[in-house]
Structure formats: structure tokens, C-alpha cells
Amino acid sequence: MKHRNFTFDKTSYLQLSELGSKFNLSFSSHLVLGNKIIGLDGANKRLLVSEINDGYSKSYIIELDKVSAISVKKTYNSIKPGELNKRKFEEFLKTIHLQFEFADEAETILLPFYENETDNIRDLPRLERNAKNWQLILSKIIGAQISEVAKERRQLLLTD
């Protein structure tokens, strides 16, 4: 099993490198998440997401310049009365996503970090920590640009 994961990681990193070259990206951070690998090009404010399913790969780039907010979104299964006496709260957790909201509000992208159907609950603390860390890093990147937009708007208001 470890050998298989190592092969996937090696293949993923090779694919990330090739895609980075193809799209002229230079990654400052990256992370393997199950069948996905994400790479951050902080200088160009782009996040590459590459996913491998059944031997086919699908990749897309999130332009962080167009993102207005990034949050960690958790969804839970329904909890019936008395179930919390038998099971821990985190056992009801269904997914943890990094949610990207765009300035034009036309689109929202959900990047899964934890899915209870495919991920082991023992990995939950690590995956949740990863989601929060990436949310913090990416929010700082878009925060600088949002601050610039706010300054420009204030300048426009002052000149009117």
C-alpha cells in the first residue's frame, strides 16, 4: 500500500510539474489530497487543481485575483435525538471543503479536503488542519488585493 501511494505521489508531482510548465506557473506550495494535487503559484496568484480519476486527469486553475472570499465549509449528516450520546460529533461530519467565492458572485468552487465516503475518520484532524492552513494562506493572498480595491474605492469616493 505504501508503495502504491508513493507511486501516486511521484506521478502527481510529475504531472504538477508538467502542468506548471505548460501554464507558466511556479509553485511555492503544493499538497496531495487523495486523487487530487493542488499547487499554489503565489507570485501569479493562481491555484492549480489537478484530479486523476480512472486514469484520466482533469485540471483547472483558480484565478485568485477574481476571488472575493475563501472559507472552510463543513457539512454534516442529520443528527437524530439521542445519537450524540452514542456517537461523537465528528462522526456526523460529511465533508470539509475550501469554498472559493468570486467577486462577480456568478460562481462558487468547492475544493474537497475531507469526504466521509472516501477518507478515513482518523485522517480528519490532519485534513481539517490542512484546509484551515490553505484557507489562511490563500486569504492572505487575496486579502492584499481586496485591500487595494478598497483603497481605490475610497479614493474614488473622496474625489467625487
Where are the model-predicted features located?
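Short, surface-exposed coil-to-beta transition loops
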Residues: 33, 57, 93-96
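Acidic, Ser/Thr- and proline-rich intrinsically disordered linker/docking segments
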Residues: 70-160
